[in-house]
Amino acid sequence: MRNSYVGCCVFAVVMMLMVGVPAVSGAQVAVGITVGFAPPDLPVYEQPICPEEGYIWTPGYWAYDPDFGDYYWVPGTWVLAPEVGFLWTPGYWGWGGSGFVFYEGYWGPRVGFYGGVNYGYGYFGHGYEGGRWDGGHFFYNRSVNNVNVTVIHNVYNTTVINERNTRVSYNGGHGGINERPRPEEEIAARERHTPPVPDQRQHVQAAR
C-alpha cells in the first residue's frame, strides 16, 4: 500500500517558505490537504462540444479523496463565465517540501500561473490559447476547441504549436514540471478574482 497522509490546516505562506516549493501566484492558496505521493499523469481524453456562447473550457485534473486515500479524475467541462471578460486559471498540484499541495483555480480578467502544466485544449502551460473576449462576447479558437459553428458564430482559427508533449500533472518535486510564474502571471495574481462557481463545486463532487 502506498504511504500517504493528509495534513490539515496547510497554509500557502508556510509552504512557500519551505525548501523546494514551487513559486505560487498570490491568488492561489493551498486547499488544506497535503498528499505524500504524486498525482498520476494526465489522461488523454476528448473535449465535449461547447454547449453555447459564453462557456469557457475548464480542463480536467486530479483531485484527492482523503476518505479513500487516493486521487480521482475530475473531467474537464464547459462552465459559464461568472462575469463578462473573466477567464479561468486552472488549479494545480505543487510540491510543498514534504508532500504535494493543491492550489485551487480561480476566475479573473486574465489567466494566471497554473504550474506550467500542459492541460491541453488551449492550456499549454502558460496562458490560454483557446479563445478571447472581444466587445462583451467570447470568441473561440476552433483549432483547439470543439465548437459547433451552427450554434456559435463567434469563432476564429489560429493554429497553436504545442511543443510540450509531457502529461506530467504537477509542479516541482521529483519528476515534476520546473516552471515559475511569468511577469504577466504575477500581475494576474494581484487582480480581482472569483473562486470556482457552484456548478464547478458540484462537478467535483459528482466525480468522486
Write out the residue ranges for each language-model feature.
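Low-complexity, repeat-rich tail regions
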Residues: G20, V79-R208
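Residue-level detector of alpha-helical hydrophobic segments embedded in or interacting with membranes
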Residues: L17, T34-A38, P43-E46, G176-N178, ...
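Blade-edge beta-strand/turn elements of extracellular beta-propeller
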Residues: Y71-P75
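Residues embedded in well-ordered secondary-structure elements
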Residues: M16, E46-P48, T77, V117
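Extended non-catalytic interaction/regulatory regions in multidomain proteins
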Residues: P22-F68, V111
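Classical secretory targeting signals
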Residues: M1-Q28
